[in-house]
């Protein structure tokens, strides 16, 4: 069973629908017992980093996630991926879960092409940097759907894939059993479904 962690942030319905389409059992829950009972965990998220971390802390889930991430695969999606990092500079400075070394920084100041819009909204090719079971059913250069104004930085050793947005945007990270995708697999059509299928088989 996959537990989609419900901490009041994220579009949980589309994610659960994508997993159901694959025939995968998924439960939306903020209950520590459900998280511990699950085979795999997904941490979704949309919105601001600081607010999301505050909600995770308020629900008491931070120590549960740190404990369980050592035992089973965890996938952070979009803001959920950013929460995996040590720190974010979105509207101030905030500590993250600390699974992935590096920081979450604003995209706009780093763009080589200042005519590009921020947030990055839309489809972008994902370039795989190395073999990993998460890419079992995904080909290099396939397109995935992004919506973000911040990105993971100083994390090259943990980066599995990037997309070009006048600079290499961190698309996928990994640290131990913990994975993160900046793009939304649940909004990325067939390629996204195939990535979720591979995650369910980890």
Task: Describe every region a protein language model picked out.
Residues 42-44:
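Structural motif
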Residues 38:
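An anion/phosphate-binding loop that grips the pyrophosphate of nucleotide cofactors and donors
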Residues 34-35, 68, 172:
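Structural alpha-helical scaffold elements that stabilize or flank donor/cofactor-binding regions
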């Amino acid at each position: 069973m996959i537990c989609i962690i419900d901490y009041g942030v994220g579009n949980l319905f589309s994610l659960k629908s994508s997993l159901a389409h694959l025939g995968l059992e998924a439960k939306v829950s903020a209950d520590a017992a459900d998280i511990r009972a699950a085979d795999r965990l997904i941490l979704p998220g949309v919105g601001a980093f600081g607010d999301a971390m505050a909600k995770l802390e308020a629900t008491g889930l931070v120590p549960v996630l740190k404990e369980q991430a050592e035992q089973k695969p965890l996938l952070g999606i979009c803001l959920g991926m950013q929460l995996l990092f040590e720190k974010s500079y979105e509207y101030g400075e905030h500590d993250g879960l600390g699974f992935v070394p590096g920081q979450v920084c604003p995209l706009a100041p780093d763009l080589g092409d200042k005519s590009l819009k921020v947030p990055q909204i839309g489809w972008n090719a994902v370039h795989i940097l190395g073999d990993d079971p998460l890419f079992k059913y995904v080909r290099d250069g396939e397109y995935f759907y992004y919506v973000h104004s911040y990105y993971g930085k100083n994390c090259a050793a943990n980066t599995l894939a990037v997309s070009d947005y006048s600079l290499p945007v961190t698309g996928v990270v990994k640290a131990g059993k913990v994975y993160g995708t900046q793009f939304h697999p649940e909004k990325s059509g067939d390629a996204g479904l195939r990535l979720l299928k591979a995650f369910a088989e980890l």
